[in-house]
């Protein structure tokens, strides 16, 4: 007969977390253990009825053992238990049920370093509070509860586990799409086909604009090279003239509650109508479909989160403690006009994050997106205007870096929010100092030489998955992407072999093909710089591992470059290039000190199963975000506020509780109550006595 083993499965907690992280409609697994127990018995019943099949039932649950014994009758089957567990349980079962069916022991075989994580995982699962073994050994557990049929426990889903959309108490989680379901992918492909062959017209939106001063550009798909739109860039002279004066829009006079309602309306619209943005994320920005879906979710989260945070900040005044007879009130007011300069690598999420923060707090906004993604910026601006944001409150300027430089000189600015390179941030800071009498607020989020430290206790399979995602998702074109993998020498070669092996199976090509993993570099200039860097490294004698070839002067294959020291790195390489170096056991703090000397401080990854070691690294590393035993990309709004220090940025973290404070001025009104006729509060106290 054919042998078939039935198990209840593992990593249930991972599946629950995964559905919450990706905003799925529901869960791919049961949320109540009783549902799993019933399904197990249903499968067991089916297996027992099949001829020429020898079922092997792996379980440590006495009720399941008894139920299968009852269902099995004279059928030929086996029980299985895990090596080192369940011995007393099965001895008890034999004494009650007899020795009609044999019990085999499932004993995994392998090297110690591979087996230990597996065995620990099994012990943790079987030792969980909900497990039968744990309840059996608990003297306070009622024996009737242990014997109760799981059928009586399945009336409803677990109330302890909220649906993915409701995991945040004070706001909705953005809806995602389960891309592991082929039906979802097929439906999405059909929807996106509706935009093929259509072209968009993208142009600036601001008062007194003269279309005659614009230069036309044809935008082509990064995925297939077809025309996707006509884009009009205005001259620096016309921009300088248009923004030489400023009149506040009606938006600045609205209540924070009204503004929040409008922004949440925009969030709902984008969440329910994502396909056009998805299409141009793929074709204009070269995004993989998974990254595109994640980006739209992040934009929706920004809109909802900043709406709620603005209400907390501005809806009520704050009465401060002080001496009797005096009233001190703190309030927050809009700064004025903000210039928001957003990048091409997150043309939806970061653009919407910047402008929604400024708008939520009552400011007027000039949006200056990257010259590489003007169509997406135009679509977003139109959505904001159609859903209730006045054109005077949100103006759009399309153009290259010179147009952005011109805008930074505008005397009407009260603040600038920027995401991009460190060099550009320095230029903006210098321009603000040179061209403004007052000190203009500058919020900058820049790049980083992001590292990941891996010690010998790490689970290398998980390390490999997290390295691939961190270094090569979005073709490495994220400011949070992994640039340097620092591995303890004891496992160094194993890590390189596993990561290089994983790189080999990555598919490179147009992102309109959902089967591809790595998409294009944003421009041919960027491609040339990355290719030159790799070639120079090879000429200099560094070991370069590159399983794939360059394609069409736009696709850089995932690349490993081995280095000896962090001092060999001078700046960030914005693409799928991963540097790898080793360190000696016992020198982790020395590694952290070397990382701190880089003066970048954005993200840091740590892979270790020694919790005290991870905590010590997090305490001593000068970085904004530390990720332990996971990838280092994909920060979630309100959950992992994102931003760095040093060369990696200024100010408070985006998507965090302090971010909006940068968009407001504080005012304190101190009132001497005695001067208005006496301190009635104090006098009333005297009367009570």
Where do the protein language model's features map onto the residues?
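N-terminal Rossmann NAD(P)-binding subdomain characteristic of aldehyde/semialdehyde dehydrogenases
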Residues: 251, 257, 261-351, 355, ...
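ALDH superfamily catalytic-core signature
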Residues: 386-388, 415, 423-564, 586-589, ...
């Amino acid at each position: 007969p054919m042998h078939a083993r039935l198990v209840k499965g593992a990593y249930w907690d991972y599946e629950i977390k995964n559905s919450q992280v990706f905003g799925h409609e529901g869960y791919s697994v049961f949320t109540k253990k009783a549902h799993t127990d019933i399904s197990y018995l249903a499968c067991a019943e089916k297996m027992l009825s099949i001829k020429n099949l020898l079922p092997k039932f792996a379980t440590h649950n006495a009720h399941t053992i008894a139920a299968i014994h009852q269902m099995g009758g004279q059928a030929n089957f086996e029980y299985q238990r895990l090596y080192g567990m369940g011995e007393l349980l099965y001895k008890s079962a034999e004494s009650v049920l007899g020795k009609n069916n044999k019990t085999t022991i499932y004993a995994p075989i392998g090297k110690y370093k591979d087996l230990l994580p597996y065995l620990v995982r099994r012990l943790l699962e079987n030792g969980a509070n909900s497990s039968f073994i744990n309840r059996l050994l608990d003297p306070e557990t009622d024996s009737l509860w242990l014997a109760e049929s799981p059928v009586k426990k399945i009336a409803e889903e677990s109330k302890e586990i909220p649906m993915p959309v409701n995991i945040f108490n004070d706001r909705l989680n953005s809806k995602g799409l389960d891309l592991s379901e082929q039906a979802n992918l097929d439906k999405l492909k059909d929807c996106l086909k509706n935009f093929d062959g259509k072209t968009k017209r993208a142009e600036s939106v601001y008062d007194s604009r003269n279309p005659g001063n614009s230069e036309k550009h044809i935008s082509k798909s990064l995925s297939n090279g077809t025309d996707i739109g006509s884009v009009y860039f205005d001259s620096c002279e016309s921009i300088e003239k248009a923004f030489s004066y400023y009149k506040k829009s009606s938006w600045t006079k609205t209540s924070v509650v009204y503004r929040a309602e409008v922004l949440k309306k925009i969030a709902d619209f984008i969440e329910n109508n994502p396909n056009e943005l998805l299409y141009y994320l793929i074709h204009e920005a070269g995004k993989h479909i998974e990254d595109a879906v994640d980006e739209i979710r992040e934009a929706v989260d920004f809109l909802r989160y900043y709406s709620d945070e603005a209400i907390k900040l501005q809806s009520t005044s704050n009465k401060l403690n002080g001496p009797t007879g005096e009233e001190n009130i703190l309030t927050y007011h809009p700064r004025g006009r903000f210039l928001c300069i957003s990048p091409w690598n997150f043309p939806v999420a970061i653009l919407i994050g910047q402008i929604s923060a400024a708008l939520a707090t009552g400011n007027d906004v000039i949006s200056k997106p990257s010259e590489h993604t003007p169509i997406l910026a135009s679509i977003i601006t139109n959505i904001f205007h159609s859903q209730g944001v006045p054109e005077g409150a949100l103006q759009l300027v399309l153009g290259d870096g010179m147009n952005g430089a011109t805008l930074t000189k505008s005397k009407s600015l009260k603040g600038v929010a920027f995401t991009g390179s460190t060099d550009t941030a320095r230029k903006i800071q210098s321009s603000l100092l040179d061209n403004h009498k007052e000190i203009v607020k500058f919020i900058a989020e820049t790049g980083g030489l992001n590292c990941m430290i891996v010690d010998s206790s790490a689970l290398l399979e998980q390390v490999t998955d997290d390295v691939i995602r961190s270094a090569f998702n979005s073709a490495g074109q994220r400011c949070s992407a992994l640039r340097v993998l620092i591995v303890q020498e004891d496992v160094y070669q194993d890590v390189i072999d596993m990561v290089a092996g994983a790189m080999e199976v990555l598919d490179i090509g147009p992102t309109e093909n959902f089967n591809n993993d790595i998409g294009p570099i944003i421009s041919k200039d960027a491609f040339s710089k990355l290719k030159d860097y790799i070639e120079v490294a090879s000429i200099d004698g560094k070991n370069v591992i590159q399983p794939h070839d360059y394609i069409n002067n736009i696709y850089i294959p995932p690349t490993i470059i081995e280095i000896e020291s962090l001092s060999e790195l001078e700046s960030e390489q914005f693409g799928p290039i991963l540097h790898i170096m080793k360190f000696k056991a016992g020198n982790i703090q020395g590694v952290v000190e070397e990382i701190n000397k880089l003066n970048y401080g954005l993200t840091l990854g740590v892979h270790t199963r020694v919790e005290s070691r991870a905590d010590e690294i997090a305490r001593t590393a000068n970085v904004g975000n530390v990720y332990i035993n996971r990838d280092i990309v994909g920060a979630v709004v309100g959950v992992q506020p994102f931003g760095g220090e040093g060369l990696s940025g200024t100010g408070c973290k985006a998507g965090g509780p302090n971010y909006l404070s940068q968009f407001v001025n504080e005012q304190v009104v101190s009132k001497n109550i005695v001067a208005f006729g006496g301190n009635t509060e104090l006098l009333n106290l005297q009367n009570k006595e």
